[in-house]
């Protein structure tokens, strides 16, 4: 007998219950809930889960709880990122990991391994007098999930900074367009710094997991806002072709979507072009049990085409991605655990 394990990632696109949102949460739930059920996930990583205020209470993820009602995920273990300042969930862009199996421990990382770099904007108006820290807002969420066979999977949930340019003082017009191309270019540059900085911090975390156990079962999931051949994901993967060091071969992370035929390999549509922005990267030990990937993109809408009055579709603008594994019934002992090297 083998243990089936399905790991999924899904950016829910601004999951919130604010009254001014169109479509409303009530309109979105009947659309999103069947999508979640179809995933049939044992571990589910979610992005863009918003927090809700209740009078006299802490911010809660009540919109997510409503979405999960009457689904298998309603009873799953749940861990989330929190705002370091308030120690509560944030109002925006929370990460969530749901698990059928026990979550043995969890943590989040925000500038713990990669301090914020300092940078002085070159196009800002008025001119900046000194370099300022470039921080990224979204933490890394890490959970150790204990499987029934005694094996432990390190699950990392990520939402990397988008390509949307960071604001540059003095370079935006009232209609939010850019006054200058150079201001836009610097905004894109700073956003790239944030995205690659998040990837660097994640890669340092991955290195520490491998230091603890060279055979770690690792799955890095989420909305990376980049395709496979771009810098942030190359930093996460750590390919031997880039490091030039064969001794690091066991520390490479492998993209699971590569077994999806290229015409169907996209999780986001923009201007008629499909892009694979959502990924599940796994360690080589995890790859041994990998059986296939699904990308549920049948109902994706093109994000450049919205209703005339800017009322958006109830579906997310990202497709969920699922990786399927079959693990042994019992935990396999490695040579190092038996006293030999």
Give the ranges of each region predicted by the language model:
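Metal-dependent phosphoester-hydrolase catalytic domains
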Residues: 90, 101-109, 113-125, 129, ...
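Stable alpha-helical elements in mature extracytoplasmic
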Residues: 28, 32, 60-63, 195-198, ...
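A long, amphipathic alpha-helix that forms part
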Residues: 185-214
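Catalytic metal-binding/acid-base residues of hydrolase active sites
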Residues: 13, 49-50, 159-161, 224-227
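Active-site-proximal beta-strand elements of phosphoester/diester hydrolases
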Residues: 4-17, 109, 152-161, 180-188
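N-terminal, active-site-proximal structural segment of metallo-dependent hydrolase catalytic domains
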Residues: 1-95, 175-180, 215-217, 306-319, ...
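A solvent-exposed, charged loop/short amphipathic helix patch at secondary-structure junctions
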Residues: 166-192
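Structured beta-strand-rich core segments of catalytic domains in phosphoester-bond hydrolases
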Residues: 53-165
């Amino acid at each position: 007998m083998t243990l089936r394990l399905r790991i999924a990632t899904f950016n829910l696109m601004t999951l919130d219950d604010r009254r001014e949102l169109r479509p409303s949460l009530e309109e979105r739930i009947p659309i999103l809930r069947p999508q979640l059920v179809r995933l049939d996930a044992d571990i589910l990583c979610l992005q863009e889960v918003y927090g809700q205020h209740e009078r006299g209470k802490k911010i809660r993820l009540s919109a997510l709880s409503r979405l999960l009602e009457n689904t298998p995920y309603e009873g799953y273990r749940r861990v989330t990122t929190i705002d370091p300042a308030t120690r509560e969930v944030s109002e925006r862009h929370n990460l969530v990991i749901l698990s059928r199996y026990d979550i043995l421990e969890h943590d989040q990382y925000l500038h713990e391994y990669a301090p914020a770099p300092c940078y002085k904007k070159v196009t800002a108006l008025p001119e900046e007098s000194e370099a300022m820290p470039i921080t990224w807002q979204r933490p890394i969420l890490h959970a150790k999930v204990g499987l029934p066979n005694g094996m432990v999977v390190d699950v990392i949930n990520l939402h990397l900074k988008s390509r949307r340019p960071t604001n540059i003082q003095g370079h935006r017009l009232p209609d939010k367009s850019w006054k200058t191309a150079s201001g836009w270019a610097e905004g894109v540059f700073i956003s790239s710094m944030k995205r690659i900085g998040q990837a660097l911090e994640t890669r340092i975390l991955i290195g520490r997991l491998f230091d603890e156990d060279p055979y770690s079962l690792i799955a890095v999931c989420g909305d990376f806002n980049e395709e496979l051949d771009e810098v942030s994901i190359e930093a996460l993967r750590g390919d031997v072709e880039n490091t030039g060091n064969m001794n690091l071969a066991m520390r490479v992370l492998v993209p699971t979507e590569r077994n999806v035929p290229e015409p169907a390999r996209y999780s986001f549509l923009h201007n008629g072009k499909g892009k694979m922005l959502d990924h599940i990267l796994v360690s080589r030990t995890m790859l041994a049990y990998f059986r296939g990937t699904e990308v549920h993109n049948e109902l994706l809408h093109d994000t450049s085409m919205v209703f005339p009055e800017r009322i958006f579709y109830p579906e997310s603008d990202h497709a969920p991605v699922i990786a399927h594994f079959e693990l042994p019934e019992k935990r396999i002992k490695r040579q190092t655990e038996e006293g030999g090297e």
